[in-house]
Amino acid sequence: MNLGRKGKPMKISFKKVASIAVSTALVTTGLVAAPAIAATKNLTVETVFQLTSTDPARSFEQTGNMINRALYETLLTYKGGDASTQVPGIASKWSVNAGATEFTFTIDSRAKFADGTKVTSADVVFSLNRLKNVKGNPSSLMNGITVSAPNASTVVLTTEKATPQVLAIVTSPALGILNSKVVKANGGSDAADANTADKALEFLKTQSAGSGPYVLSSFNLTTEVVLNKNTKYWGAAKAGYDKIIVRNVPVNVQRLNVIKGSSSIAVDLSPDQATNLGNKVNVVTGKASNVFFFYLSQNSTFSPATKFTADAKCIEAVRYGINYKKIVRYAGLGAIQAPGIIPSFFSGALSQKDAIVQDTARAKTAFDACGIKDTPVSIGYWGDGGAVNGLNFGSLAALVEEDLRAIGFKPKLTGAPIAVSLPLYRDNKEEMGLWLWGPDWPDSTNYTESFSPGTKVGLRMGWAAGSDSVITNLQTQASTETNAKKRAALFAEWQREMNKRSPLIPLVQPAAILVANKSVRGVQDHPIWKVNLSEIK
């Protein structure tokens, strides 16, 4: 007998008994579903990989910047597509002395790594010294900068001369802060001999050691990199997805996949490819459309026997033999001829009236004077379908080859997969090279400090320190000037002289396009990390 709340017999109808019986049967036979489990929220990003590793001290390519921006946090950073106003990262506040030689940062007391360990100044000192001493491709960012920690929450960066660009430099993902205890326990070193002593590269391919909203799940240099949500993220802007898959996909396939909905974001479409995509995607453009630029470099130490790239007349022949308008037409809507090395996004950029104009007669006269006649000249580039912003390196190289052949050169295209061609270029082993540059930090000094004699790209062209005092003097003045108008004037003059005297020829600035599914929010193009995976929801 069933009793009511007051101890009286409770009447139960036949219908109710039947209902209970049916419900019991459904439960015992497993026909009633268990409470629903929330579906995993994934984001798939497709791009043509420019990637060497996810170790901040060794990664300096666009895809690496995109990934590391989500794994590691820097002292300062930027929001959205902006690259002019720094905002807090690991540092909650900062100050600069009057001479722009001392930069003091206070670490946010809430900042924690993915394992829950508190971020301290010791982690910052270790990370930046490791970057400097590993001597990887981004190590030059720490040139002339000394890091110290007066206490556990304060970091001081010191320079010997005025270096106002330090605040921009510290936003680079290469200056991402690592958990020093974890990295040291897995072979990491920040000692002066870290270029040989540091053994953490392989470890950092298997898991990350940062404080960002995502952690590394898996890494494959040729197929995909997978990130998982950092469930212990300390910041206010939590990860928007449980998992992000960054895939290495050819440009034409990126277009098909984003239309079908099998990917969320396509990174590398050209303006022409970003048309007629249907009503399920958004096309995003940004200021970064004028940040990347393609250029042709000539190596003055490659082949003394031919003396081609060391001869000013040979360089003049190339400079005035190229049909720049044809290249811009190939680059498509939104592209412009690069009038100088510093793109129009930054201070001191040149206008189109300063751009080099093709002069075939002058080019042929210069070619005759340089005296190489039938000597073959090789042009290296990222082959095997390599493309950025929808521009195929091989197609651009073919346009340049056509122009040079028309004035008498015997060019030979020697493109190769990026794993082969990029080291050749960086190690000063290409006679000529067709390459792209995106800023390492968002300031015009990134260009003066990278393309002048004796600098990173200068040395790749065999342009040693002391090769051109005019260029070097302008570079030095621009790097230490703190007055904005004077800086801009120096940057402009430096470029005009580069256009006359350097072994580098700026070609084109392509439009930057991102295509994203309409369900994806927060997609903006950025000049340093292209897509801020941390902001996408």
Please identify what each model-predicted range represents:
Residues L43, N220, E224, K229, ...:
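Detector for C-terminal structural segments
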Residues E46-A98, N129, A209-G210:
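N-terminal lobe/hinge region of extracytoplasmic solute-binding protein
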Residues Y78, N228-K232, A288-A317, G466, ...:
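A bilobed periplasmic-binding-protein/Venus flytrap-type ligand-binding module shared by bacterial periplasmic
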Residues A174-A236:
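Gly/Pro-rich hinge or "lid" segments in bacterial periplasmic/extracellular proteins
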Residues Y214, I336-C370, G386-S395:
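Structural transition elements
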Residues T231-N276, S289:
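Ligand-site clamp/hinge motif
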